[in-house]
Curated annotation (Swiss-Prot):
Organism: Streptococcus agalactiae serotype V (strain ATCC BAA-611 / 2603 V/R)
Pathway(s) annotated for this protein in UniProt: Carbohydrate metabolism; pentose and glucuronate interconversion
Recorded name of the encoding gene: uxaC
GO biological process, one term: D-galacturonate catabolic process
Chain segments annotated as coiled-coil in the UniProt record: none
Protein name (database record): Uronate isomerase
Amino acid sequence: MAFNTETFMLKNQAAIQLYEEVKRQPIFDYHCHLDPKDIFEDHIFDNIVDLWLGGDHYKWRLMRANGISEAEITGPASNLEKFKAFARTLERAYGNPVYHWSAMELKNVFGVNEILTESNAEEIYHRLNHFLKEHKISPRRLIADSKVMFIGTTDHPLDTLEWHKKLAADESFKTVVAPTFRPDEAFIEHRHFVDFITKLGDITQKEITDFSTFIAAMEERIAYFAQNGCRASDISFTEIVFEQTDELELNDLFNKVCEGYIPNQSEISKWQTAVFMELCRLYKKYGFVTQVHFGALRNNHSTIFEKLGADVGVDSLGDQVALTVNMNRLLDSLVKKDSLPKMIWYNLNPAYNIAVANTLANFQANELGVRSYLQFGAGWWFADTKLGMISQMNALAEQGMLANFIGMLTDSRSFLSYQRHDYFRRILCTYLGEWIEEGEVPEDYQALGSMAKDIAYQNAVNYFKN
């Protein structure tokens, strides 16, 4: 069977027919890590390595596994040397999603149909660089060519949102670029917590002396984000915890940490529970969809982390005790306080998929008519694979409503990653097509095609309406 053809990843005739319904759908990319400044300034890319390999820890991780020196990954090697090193890696990467994504990016963006190998790497490298210049490939060009209607960036609570404002005022650019409120530093275990409190007080002109004044300052920033088009928040937790305490202990803990105290795990859990519940109350008040990424064990190779920083390819999926106990207690407490916002839960460890989907199904009741008020998010990071996507959809279909799923997001730092939406759509169509082929659902292409289109695009549009 030929590789990377029009029927790539479409395993049956039903899938091919369903794909015709979704392949031209626009993209609603509600969570990514693109820099809005890059989108606004719209510089033309002049080297494929900067565009394709720069900042891509998926590729870096794979290259290290293939014995590539750090000099050729993140170090001082020339761009051509880095490109050749990646090609040398890619030709051995069968079975890894990076192999598929790379082939799709080369073909669909640059018109390169050959399989990239070490032997043709130099010729393709020069051809790609020529293509970038000849076609004036820039961030906005890639966004427009991919039919991206909405981009949700990931933004620090103290960000001025200068570049979002400029993009919103630019009538020549039709894609909506909305900020996302990401308050990682609001949690006491974060190494920048104390500095964050100081800067938060400065920007809000508030004296932050305890838990309540801290939350009041956070609300001011949330309101500022809301005024500038924000539709969502995001947070990443290593574990989902639920450990309640009173405000007296929170105030004491706040002051001790600000004076240099290192909190223990129970104190970290109490602060996480209290702060997240207050944030959820505010997110509901301001109409933010609340995204929760959980289960990542980060920066495990301490030497690489100390040299290169975070998000460089040395992270793992984690595990935890009492996940569903804590999730149920947390969500139930939010319901009791009328503080449950629309939420998307992204689970990193597929072993918990059924448990997470099952737990979310307990709390779907709402009087707003929102379908799947709590969303089980798409396979994330290490689960952003064929098997990871299928595992997530299996769990959601069996424990909830797959038809209401808001579908794919890039969660990426690369302007080439929109091919992942097409990758997901192909896998989705094969998944639904197998139901038809095996007689598990009626052979109703209108109904299944409509379902596929909803998952590919329309469900997300509807879900993120304020």
